[in-house]
Amino acid sequence: MKDPYDVIKRHYVTEKAKTLEGLSLGNGEGKKKGSFCKHPKYTFVVSCDATKPLIAQALESIYADKKVKVKSVNTICVKPQPARMFRGKRKGKTAGFKKAVVTFYEGHSIG
């Protein structure tokens, strides 16, 4: 098995990812006021060659002290987006990456 920190690069923080986490906490930060889900979901940036079972094993080993169990892993490959640099004079692209939305079992949380 690879080093878990080579598989999981970092926590992915966006407004949508925070809304998913808020739904699992039941604090009403979702689309519907007071809505929540039983299974907590967290989003991570992962290695491009990481598979779903490898991501699940890496997260369970990183958070072994909290004894979390992964229920499911959904992966999304984000394509490079066009970008302009140096006040619009130079065209380029942002780097593409792979993100994983991980669902834990009820009662298990990393937060």
UniProtKB/Swiss-Prot annotation:
Known role: One of the early assembly proteins it binds 23S rRNA. One of the proteins that surrounds the polypeptide exit tunnel on the outside of the ribosome. Forms the main docking site for trigger factor binding to the ribosome.
One example GO MF annotation: structural constituent of ribosome
Entry keywords, A to Z: Ribonucleoprotein, Ribosomal protein, RNA-binding, rRNA-binding
Gene: rplW
Any Pfam family matching the protein: Ribosomal_L23
Family: Belongs to the universal ribosomal protein uL23 family.
Annotated protein name in UniProt: Large ribosomal subunit protein uL23
Xref: HAMAP family: Ribosomal_uL23_B
GO biological process, one term: translation
Lineage of the organism: Bacteria, Pseudomonadati, Chlamydiota, Chlamydiia, Chlamydiales
Domain of life: Bacteria
Summary of subunit composition and partner proteins: Part of the 50S ribosomal subunit. Contacts protein L29, and trigger factor when it is bound to the ribosome.
GO CC terms of this entry: ribonucleoprotein complex; ribosome
